[in-house]
Amino acid sequence: MIQRSLAALVAAALLAPSARAGDAERALPPEESFFRTLHAARRVGPVTLNGRMDEPAWQAAELGSGFTQARPSEGAPPSVQTRFRILWDDEAIYVGAECDDPEPSTDTLSRRDRFVEGDYVSFDFDTTHDRRTAYHFQVFSAGQQLDGIHYNDTDMTTDWDGAWDSAVSHTAKGWSFEARIPLRLLRIPDRAHAFGFNIYRILSRLHEEDQWRYRPLGRPGDISRLGVLEGIDGIHPVRALELRPYVGARLIRTAPAPGTTVPDAALGACSSVGLSPYRVSEACVGLDLRYNLASDLALVGTINPDFGQVEADQRVLNLSTFETFFPEKRSFFLEGIDLF
């Protein structure tokens, strides 16, 4: 009798979490209720990147709003309002947003592509609408940028660096920004189609994340659950040539063998045939290039790549037992990273 009672108690304890999980899943609205669509307007008139969105051209674009809180109160209205608009022309896509905040967090300035504590807005473009890959762009209230590539729906790398522009402006109501994303950075098929799109806002002091196209935390998928951006069609290939030269140098000094007397001049003197045997210098020059053949096809090449060097200009104090890892930043080796 006691054994049967104990078995029933254990079974009830095991079934309770699954029942609660099932109740939470059933409590979520159907997926169709989260779908969002926005229409991007073709730019008519100039847009100056000053962060204020005060040009008449912005008024022609549909106003996006109605964010939903993802954290900490999942599904609740946001604490403050966020409004955004999207423009485009033959060369770029423009994203502008106004972020209300009566008590903005202290801006933390940092290097590009560094996650820091602070307020920011990020947005994703799935330009091929394959629901697996997307370009990620992020603008902090302090003005710094971060970008990367989403792949396999839920994975992301920030190793990819795109050349795009943004500007931030602060007002008594909060802050706003304008961003210009050149089309030459994006793979866009020639055929007319919609983009996958979503925009997010982080409020650091409240530990809050607001989403335009709300993604419930209990359901898997990131890029497959983006909203839809319509109106960008008739784009012609931007045949831009991008060149990234680099120069590297290395100096090696070898100390003379013990007991060997070497004139001081020999350690640093140059001769007609080069440096002295105790000083050896090496120099290398290379080039990465990219040429857009079509809106979704690019020729990427490299000349004399330096396989032994990575970007290492950031000082890193490593007190752990693990080696310091520096991410790959050379564009040639990052092209197609979402495919391999």
PLM regions and their residue ranges:
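Structural preference for beta-rich elements and adjacent junctions enriched in aromatics
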Residues: 20-340
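Bacterial N-terminal signal peptides that target proteins for export
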Residues: 1-7
